[in-house]
């Protein structure tokens, strides 16, 4: 498929199930890390990946991800799921996945704010930056995933930055759960 549009290189991020993330490129892709977690407390349910592409003397770090989609936490027995939902277990689990992914990728660089990094995928989470459209309480756990990214990484939400007064759904409904982040040097090149 990638060859149809001139891409002869393919990369598949880490995945534990049938939901992998795939990127294609005209340039060789180096696998930096396939991320699935390292135990019950840090399982990345649908996986993530860190790939690197070098071109024209530049180095582009690409992080792909797909976090847990349910309202209850991952690994919860069926009979305990309603309790987990009531405690916002899914939001808290996704936040753990985001922290783990960031620590395994962009946090590995001591100079990420000056490098080309992008992170994209199905976050299955809403962002506080869209709350003017949601009008949710400021203390909702629904924002935990993106709060972590905004507070602990140099990533910029590309869509929100480019179109600050607009809202773009990614679900066909009234939510945005798919995001594209990048660092400032890459953002300036867009």
Question: Could you describe each region identified by the protein language model?
Answer:
Residues 1-72:
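Structured beta-strand-rich core segments of catalytic domains in phosphoester-bond hydrolases
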Residues 2-5, 41, 79-80, 134-139:
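Glycine-rich, phosphate-binding/catalytic loops in enzymes
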Residues 12-16, 41-43, 86-93, 172:
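Extracytoplasmic/periplasmic, Sec-exported soluble proteins
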Residues 67, 122-123:
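Active-site metal-binding loops of divalent metal-dependent hydrolases
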Residues 87-113:
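A long, amphipathic alpha-helix that forms part
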């Amino acid at each position: 498929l990638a060859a149809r549009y001139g891409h002869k290189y393919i990369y598949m991020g880490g995945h534990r199930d049938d939901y992998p993330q795939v990127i294609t490129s005209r340039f060789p892709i180096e696998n930096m890390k396939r991320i699935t977690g390292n135990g019950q407390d840090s399982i990345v349910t649908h996986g993530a990946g860190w790939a690197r592409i070098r071109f024209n003397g530049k180095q582009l770090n690409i992080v792909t991800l797909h976090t847990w989609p349910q309202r209850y936490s991952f690994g919860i027995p069926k009979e305990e799921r309603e309790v987990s939902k009531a405690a916002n277990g899914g939001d808290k689990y996704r936040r753990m996945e985001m922290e783990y992914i960031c620590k395994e990728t962009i946090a590995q660089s001591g100079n990420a704010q000056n490098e080309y990094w992008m992170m994209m995928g199905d976050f299955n989470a809403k962002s506080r930056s869209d709350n003017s459209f949601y009008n949710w309480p400021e203390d909702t756990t629904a924002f935990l995933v993106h709060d972590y990214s905004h507070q602990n990484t140099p990533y910029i939400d590309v869509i929100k930055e480019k179109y600050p007064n607009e809202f773009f759904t990614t679900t066909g409904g009234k939510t945005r759960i798919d995001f594209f982040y990048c660092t400032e040097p890459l953002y300036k090149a867009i």
